[in-house]
Amino acid sequence: MKLDLLSFSNMLYYNIIKLGEIIVKIAYVFKSNMASTFQLGTMILPQLEDNSHMVNVIGMFFFDDNIMCLQKGNPVGERLAKIAKEKKMLLMVCDQCAVRRELAEGTFEQCGSGEVKAKGLVDGVVAGCFPQLYSALGPNAPDQVITL
């Protein structure tokens, strides 16, 4: 039997859905302008909510203005916080980005130390830098990191 790539992809997709298997652990980094509004808010989050995303998202790290979607009361942030709690998903904002936007308690000198604390953000969000991200994800390391 000859199997083309499309048939193989469809078969793989069917088997993953049918068996309920999650084959890859993913961490997302939201760096590009509007990534949390567009890719997260309109694609990733709805798929996580209806369990059609097909991968196990173990963490999300937010830079620059992408952290704004995580402000308390923001509909995207509130929905994401609910999913993160259910799925035990890490939500971390860049500590320096949060300090600059008054969404963290701490100083620039404390950035990267683990001493900066998120404030005014949805439940479950922590502030940190790469050392804190690596430490938090280390015991459950992702198979892939996707930067958007």
What feature does the model see in each segment?
Residues 53-58, 89:
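A generic structural motif
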Residues 4-23:
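Short, Lys/Arg-enriched N-terminal segments with co-localized hydrophobic residues
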Residues 36-55:
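Histidine-anchored nucleotide/phosphate-binding helix
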